[in-house]
Amino acid sequence: MFEEDEEGTFLHVLITGRLKVFKTADDERQVVLYLMRDGETIGEHLIDKPGAYGYTAESISDSVILLLRLDALREIIRQNLSFCRGVNGLIFTRLQKAENRMLNYRFNRTEERVCFFLKEMVEHDSRKLVTGEREIKFLMTQAFIGDMVSVSRQQVTLVLRNMAQRKILKYNRRRLVIFRPDLL
């Protein structure tokens, strides 16, 4: 989609698909900020103050994205108060999610972080099987989960193995089925 040092000229609206939004640390590691889902936007911070995006957005599944020119959007906002309120609502929702994620990662152990992420995936990216179990539709590697919760792939493997032994979930390279979402 775009790199963090690229000049921001568009507000991106994700119609369908998934985007990983991240910053690159000094040691070239990716620090994942969030996973964008259908209907979410990115680039709103540039509406008021033009500049670089400040992060990288990368498609991790087939995606359809609507691009809105920021200069045209600024004019619409200037002329339409209710539209402005809607954009503010998007920004406030994103801020609240970021604060929750930051607090979760700051004060919780590895297993709790992984559970928090899996709960989010069950809520947004799963389907209910006839058995009542939840299958996460989005294929994820343990490294991807680790990136999302700021832990190593090895730590994710240990957590998933432990949860599988406790009959909370079953996983392999192609599927992740949650038997007991209430225990996440």
Spans of model-derived segments:
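Alpha-helix/helix-capping structural signal
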Residues: T16, E40, D71-A72, A143, ...
